[in-house]
Every structure is written in C-alpha cells, then in structure tokens.
From Swiss-Prot:
Positions with biased composition (Basic and acidic residues): 1-19
Region (Calmodulin-binding): 10-89
Protein name: Calmodulin-binding protein 60 C
Species of provenance: Arabidopsis thaliana (Mouse-ear cress)
Region (Disordered): 1-35
Length: 622
C-alpha cells in the first residue's frame, strides 16, 4: 500500500516538473506576431491584381498559341495552307476589285418583331467600293445592281482583309427552323443607285438562341442576274444577338439617358438584388447613380455589396459613363476670385480664376493637388454650389495649358479718389437739366480692385469701353452682362484716372445729336426696369449678387447711393461717334442696372433678416 502511494507521488512530481519545463519553454519563445490589417489588405490587393493580370493575359496567350500553330502547319503543308488562305477573287472588268460594304453599325441588341435600325435610329447604308481606288463606284452596270439581304452565322469570323470565297459565304447562311416563318422578313432586296443603297424595313421572326454561337450577322450579296462574269465580294456586319420580344421591356439603353431608371444599366436587373439595394439607398435613375459614383465610388460599391464583382463593376461603370450629359454646370466659389466648375454629374471639369477658365486637363500636377482640396470642400458644402446653364459661362476666356494660376495681377492705381456711382447729375441730350440719373463722372483707363493685401483686376471687366457698353444693349432693351463672383472688403476703394480729353459723363452725352424728349417719367423707368429684370442675363446677374451670403462685406453690403461700380476703359471720342444711334439706349441701360441693384439690395436684406431669425430661434432653443 505504501509502495503504491510512493509511486503515485513520484509520478505526480515528474508530471509537475514536465509542465513547469513546458511553461518555461513557452515563455522563452517569442510570441508570434499577428498580421497587421494593412498587410492583409495589401495581400488581398496583390491577389486581385494577379487575377486581373491572368485574365488579361489569357487572350494574348491564346492568340500567340494560335499563331504558332499556324506557323507549324505552314511548315508541314505550305502548299495546302497557301491554297486554303489565298482569297478566291475574280477581278472585275479592267482589273477592278469590287467589294460591298456596310457603312452603318446596327443598334443592338435586336428583338424579334422589331425593326432593324442603325445606331441611334439612323438608316443603314451600303456602298459598292472599288478597292483599287478606295472610292465608291458610281458608274457602270455594277453601280445599279440589286442586292440580297441574308442572315449569316455569327461564327463567320473571317477578317475583311483576308477575304473569302463565294462558297465560304454561302456555307455560313442561316435558314429558318423547320416549321417556322422565314427568318428575315421585309425588304430583303436593295437596289444600288450610283453605288449607294439603303436598307428598308427588316424584321427578325426568330431569336438567335437556337444556333451554336447564339448570334447572327447580316450579309449582302449580288442578286442572280447581275454582275455576271465578275466577282463582287459580299459584305457582312458584326455579330449580334436577337432576343425574344418579351425581353424588350427589360432592354438596356445604349447609351443610357440621365433620366433612365437605374436598371437600364448593364449588370443591374429590373427588380433584382442590385436594383433593390440602389432604390433603398435613394438611387432611382442613371443621373443619381453617376453623381454618387463621382463623389464617392466606394460608398456606391458598399451599397451594391459583395455580390458585385470587380469585372461586373467595370462593365457597369463603363456603360454608365457613355451617358450623354446635359449642358447644366455647377460652380462652387471657395474664394472671391476662384470658382470650381462641375458638370451635370458633379464631376470636376475646370477652374475659374480671375477672368480665365482652366479646363481640368490643362492643370499641372501641383495645381491638381490644390484643386483636389477645393473639390472635396465643394462636396462637403454642396448646398453653396450655384447651378448655371453652360452657355452663361461662355464669356470666360479659356486657357488650354497653364504653368501657374496667379490670382494677383499687376496693378497701376493712381491716388485720385473715386467718385460715387450715384453722385453725378446727367443732363439730357437737349441740354436741359435732367433728373439725377446714375452715371459715372469720369472714364478710367484702368480699373483695379484692392482687397486686403492683394490686388485683383475685375474679372472680365463689366464693360471694357463705352463702345462695348453700347453694343451690349440688345434690341429688346435688355443688358447683356458678363460678371464674375462678387468681391469685397471693409476698406474697399475704386480709383480712377480720367483721360485728359474727356471731362465727364456730361461731355459724352453732349456729343450725341439724338436726344430724348423731356425727362423719363417714374412709371416709364419702372416699366423698363421690370422688363430688364425679366431678362435671362439679368437674372444671372442677380444670382451672382446673392451667392456670397451675408457674412462678408461686398459691394452689395454698401449703401444704395454709394455703390462703387466698375469704370469704363479709356477710349477716344471717335469710338463714341461710331455708334450714336444706341446712345439713348445706353442711358436707359444704366437706369435698368440701377433698378437691378436696388432690387438686389432688397433681396439681400430679406435674406439677412431670415438668417437673423433662424439664429435667434437657435439661441432660444439652447
């Protein structure tokens, strides 16, 4: 008994000793490092890149193997191979090589019972070419031949340069299935006129799913009885699929329209999983899909989920990018003289700096880094972006390539003080005193605006000279203006330097022979001002005035009677005599601008009052 107890005790001691040794060894061994998340992501990306590389190399390897096999066969049987590959052609009279050719691409996919059309609904044209000259054959009996339209197997892959014999062409004809109607109905013959023909109405009665390659081609051949004794090579189209008309309701659009439902895009089935996920995220049409893809493509991928593979995503993205965009543009003004321009799907398209427009592809790498920050800022503050029609921004000068975007321009400003816009009294053309029309007392040769420590030339100056100002008055009395974003500062000054030969606005008005009868009544001024306010260009002007909000000091924050306006450029008296007929309209135009300014002041005051009420409500809630 005691012996057993001793044996058990010894065995327990040995086991305990072994466990202690194991623990010491484990403590001495360094712990295995767990892979970091970044390394896991890198490995996953490497695997994905490797898969893409393999998929891209596959067709190249297939082509190389095919070429090597052809070379090996050529060595084994060169005579047989050359006999097989040489095109069996019979040249026309005079050694001409005549070929038929389709000049239009088909709109695919096609559906049974539907008319065969070209891309975007265009007609399908065919021509007879003389390949020795490369021109359409317009004379001779061949140029008036009749042609048969036939259906070919999609496996007829012989390249145009290789040529084919008439027997090969006939061997790939496809006939209707037993017990079915003719596969192709309608105008199955075309008559050439001076070597050119147009296909009539053609309709497929059966789909292409029952043949091995599941695709058809259209072919053209010369009808029997024409061009006897000469070889005219047939024509064929690209392979295409003909689907059952019941699937036309789910047809994809090529190209898709912005207002199309999102399931019109490839890889998104109607009422399918992807369609439901997009609708749940508030994406219902192609425009909304494209906008999110531009602003945050990763978020869009997350919405679609893991069921969307990389290849499916690439196909979907490529199809969506073929969409035709509208002419609407969006501009975000992060600074007074800088505007970031986006197209209709919120994609960055260019930069406005001063009076220049810089397309996105003209920016240098350093400039792109600066612009990327502005684009992100615009996406974060999209409620501040202003919508324009692209035609309204055509007044900016476009720069194709630039090395530097310089926001401060050289200035030369005299020390003479500026004159208030509304302090000038203008006499009528008949030399009698007139009402106090707003005008400018002097004409400046150069105008520059100072804001803080920077100097800016006004963007695309409102009017470069008096002659331009007169030509900008249209026949309807509307004023066409090209203005940049409003700029401002607390210590704003506008300094002018008068030319010696011109004294005042009165002198300019006195040079005109044509006058106005009496004074303009208040009712007439109001009527013409209302007419001007309805003008599209003036509406654009008012939108520009109201875009800065109420937190900055701009020319619009100044008093109505002390508005500093851009001065004219230096011109000679000969310029004024060139167009005297528009002088009266010029004065009326200035009156309209004055009315627009007052209306702009009113709108801004109302906006400021609304903002103050909102702030007060927020403070009360706190």
């Amino acid at each position: 008994m005691q012996t057993r107890y001793m044996e058990r005790t010894n065995s327990m001691r040995e086991k305990r000793k072994l466990e202690e040794d194991d623990n010491q060894q484990q403590q001495q061994q360094p712990e295995r490092k767990r892979p970091a998340l970044a390394s896991v992501i890198v490995e996953a990306l490497k695997m994905d890149s490797l898969q893409r590389l393999c998929s891209s190399l596959e067709p190249i390897l297939r082509r190389v193997v095919s070429e090597e096999v052809e070379r090996a066969l050529a060595k084994l049987g060169p005579a047989r191979l050359s006999e097989r590959s040489s095109p069996k052609r019979i040249e026309g009279i005079g050694g001409r090589n005549l070929q038929l050719q389709f000049r239009s691409r088909l709109s695919v996919p096609l559906f049974t019972g539907g008319k065969i059309e070209g891309e975007q609904g265009a007609a399908i044209h065919v021509v007879l070419l003389d390949m020795t000259t490369g021109h359409v054959l317009t004379v001779g009996p061949e140029a008036s031949a009749k042609l048969d339209v036939v259906v070919l197997d999609g496996d007829f892959n012989t390249e145009d340069d290789d040529g084919w014999s008439g027997e090969e062409f006939e061997g790939h004809l496809v006939k209707e299935r037993q017990g079915k109607r003719p596969l192709l109905t309608g105008d199955v013959q075309v008559t050439l006129k001076e070597g050119v023909g147009t296909l009539g109405e053609l309709i497929f009665t059966d789909n292409s799913s029952w043949i091995r390659c599941r695709k058809f081609r259209l072919g053209l051949r010369v009808s029997s009885g024409y061009c006897e004794g000469m070889r005219v090579r047939e024509a064929k189209t690209e392979a295409f699929t003909v689907k059952d008309h019941r699937g036309e309701l789910y047809k994809k659009h090529y190209p898709p329209a912005l207002d199309d439902e999102v399931w019109r895009l490839e890889k998104i089935g109607k009422d399918g999983a992807f369609h439901k996920k997009l609708n749940k995220a508030g994406i219902y049409n192609v425009k909304e899909f494209l906008r999110l893809m531009v602003k945050d493509s990763q978020k869009l991928r997350t919405i679609l989920g893991s069921g969307m593979s990389n290849r499916m995503w690439e196909t979907l993205a490529e199809h969506s990018k073929t969409c035709v965009l509208s002419e609407m543009l969006y501009v975000y003004y992060p600074e007074d003289s800088v505007g970031v321009v986006f197209n209709n799907i919120y994609e960055f398209s260019g930069l406005i700096s001063g009076k220049q427009y810089y397309p996105a592809d003209s920016l240098s790498d350093n400039q792109k880094g600066y612009v990327d920050g502005l684009v992100r800022k615009a996406y974060e503050n999209w409620e501040q972006v202003i919508e324009y029609d692209s035609k309204s921004l055509m007044n900016f000068n476009q720069v194709s390539k630039t090395d530097d975007i310089d926001y401060s321009m050289p200035v030369s400003v005299p020390s003479q003080p500026s004159t208030s816009y509304s302090d000038v009294t203008v006499e009528a053309y008949n030399q009698s005193p007139a009402s106090s029309f707003p005008g400018q007392s002097q004409l400046a040769d150069t105008t520059y605006m100072h804001f803080g420590n920077s100097s800016f030339a006004p963007q695309d100056q409102l009017v470069n000279n008096t002659h331009e100002s007169q030509s900008m008055i249209n026949s309807n009395g509307g004023v066409r203006l090209a203005l940049g974003p409003a700029t401002g500062s607390q210590n704003q000054e506008q300094l002018v330097h008068p030319p010696p030969e011109i004294n005042s606005y009165n002198d300019w008005s006195n040079t005109c022979n044509r006058g106005v009868d009496g004074f303009l009544s208040e009712e007439e001024i109001r009527a013409r001002s209302n007419e001007m306010l309805e003008n599209d260009d003036m509406q654009q002007l008012l939108r520009l005035f109201s875009m800065n909000g109420g937190d900055q000091q701009t020319p619009l924050n100044m008093g109505e009677d002390s508005f500093g306006f851009h001065s004219f450029g230096q011109t000679s008296m000969a310029d004024y005599e060139e167009d005297r007929s528009n002088s009266g309209k010029a004065v009326v135009g200035w009156l309209k601008i004055k009315a627009a300014m007052r209306w702009g002041f009113f709108i801004r005051r109302k906006a400021a009052q609304r903002r103050a009420q909102i702030v007060q409500l927020d403070e009360d809630d706190e």
